[in-house]
Amino acid sequence: MRFLAFSLMTILSVDHALGADGLEPLRYNHPGLVVDLGVGLWAWPLPTDVDNDGDFDLIVSCPDKPSNGVWLFENATGDTRQNAMPVFKPARLLSKTQKYVMPSYVDGKMRTLSPGVEYKNFETKGIEERVTLPVDPNFHKPLGKQPKGPKVRHNQWRYVDYDGNQALDLVVAVEDWSYYGWDDAWDATGKWVNGPLHGWIYRLRNEGTTQTPKYAAPEFLQVGESRLEVFGCPSPNFEDFDGDGDLDLICGEFLDKFTYFENVGTRSKPRYAPGSRLLSMDGSELAMDLEMIVPVAFDWDRDGDFDLIVGDEDGRVAFVENTGFRSTKDPKIPVFAKPKYFQQQADTLKCGALATPFGFDWDGDGDMDLLSGNTAGYIEYFENLSGSGVEAPKWNRPERLEVDGKVFRIMAGPNGSIQGPAEAKWGYTTLCVADWDHDSLPDIVLNSILGRVVWLKNIGTRTAPKLAKPQPIDVEWNGESPRLAWGWERPKGKELLTQWRTTPYVHDFNGDGLLDLSMLDSEGYLAFFERAKIGDHSIVKHPRRAFLDESNRPLQLNSGAAGKSGRRKLCFVDWDRDGKLDLLLNSANADFFKQVDTMKGNWILKNAGTLAKKNIEGHDVSPTVVDFDGNGIPDFLGGAEDGRLYYMRNPLSLP
């Protein structure tokens, strides 16, 4: 187990301990390295030639925290006709941003909208110059009766001359959650009993002119006698995809696929056929790696047809090429190549979104590497190329860890998330590296969106780790295995099924030479799962709520239910070097729970406040500790919503 062992020093005062305020994202420090292009959480792409140099650049709006902004990636390679996969320069911030910023391409120029607003000079000013449109941005009134949830999320506005009368109309795509609700709507068999997500599209006919618009009342687009619909987040793209002179429609969705609606009417009187899934060249359904996709139709490779530039939830953006071929099932449906994710010159380390880093010398070469989970459900490995004793290491691009020769990934699937089928492509991996089976090789202990705690045994060597398939963490329960008070999942055998998206932390807490486990139990209390030896093998004992506050009450780190449960990221370390194990817990950065006493095998912890003043919290911040400079003092590293890893020296390391 990697646990920083620190000798006793003069006890640092809490005031001093909380005085440092760094929190700077780790940088690759690796000239010439190329990595996936990425903003923070949620990528809304706006391809255009920003600098009028004849090649296409990429603007990406990112409404997350702490990377909120309109970000410009300049094409440093050249004409996308010759090279459709340029290497972009690191992003430059144009402005802050709002949600749901989308481009419209009118007479060879880009016009940019968000709900109820158009932005002038967007390519250079971002959202600084606003013009209000004469339409209520919240005109859609949800009618579903589900009490939970946001009612409406995605609200996408675009210009299009829908009927070819030379006056730009408005199309507005809405994502209605009022029938879906939010969470905990599974029956005992794992069937979702609430409604689906609805992705609908309105047309607001312009009865005036493009220069002086007068918009009619919104009307839903139809397919026959029914509303045209996809599973949330339609991202509508009206272009002539089949070359017959009228405007067809390609939509995205909240999940990962695309739907094509052929215009079987005319340019002036559109009429849409039932939707068909877009296919890739091998005949499989065209799909992105993640979900919450945002496609924008754009002739990126300048070959005369419309490709798709698609943003993913984790901040990446992909080129999805229109091959020019047609489906063998229907010659009207265009066929696209599989997504290729754009690349950029390496700048700051990024592990998807909601990164959950852990510092450990994974390759056994004497320096501290990083492993991290993310929303997509991968475990990514960042190799330290500098050696020990370097505070700002040179990093390699991340590798996704494999099991049995295939990239390891946890996903919820159709019914694995307490928040419903809309979360099928998410995994929310959070991990700890430790020698769980005491064979002198580091293993991985893992929790995820599923709440089933597993470990991946290292069957390789110390310098060349290799992981076996996940195995459950079995517990010797006192009686029946505890179940969660929500959801349809039940523990299998002795396995540990607990609250989702919360860190398992492995350490020899009681000093008996066996590695124990601490994490949230099924009711949100921080529990101690002690290991014990039975013959020649070890067991995990029934948990105790052994971590107490100053009033000797067990620490309940989350009292929420269902989707509000779990979500706590934590790390144990002797942060203040007083010889006692402290707790770092996710907050605006991380709260420092100082160990002040022990009592009858319990640990008494006092919340001494956040480590830093700077707030980098979106969904949460996942804390770990590192010692890149090799001085024996643990420094802070926090994985944020934007997928970046924020570093701060321990105040004890400050000059």
Regions found by a protein language model. Give the residues of each.
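Sec-dependent N-terminal signal peptides
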Residues: 3-13
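Beta-propeller-forming repeat regions
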Residues: 18-655
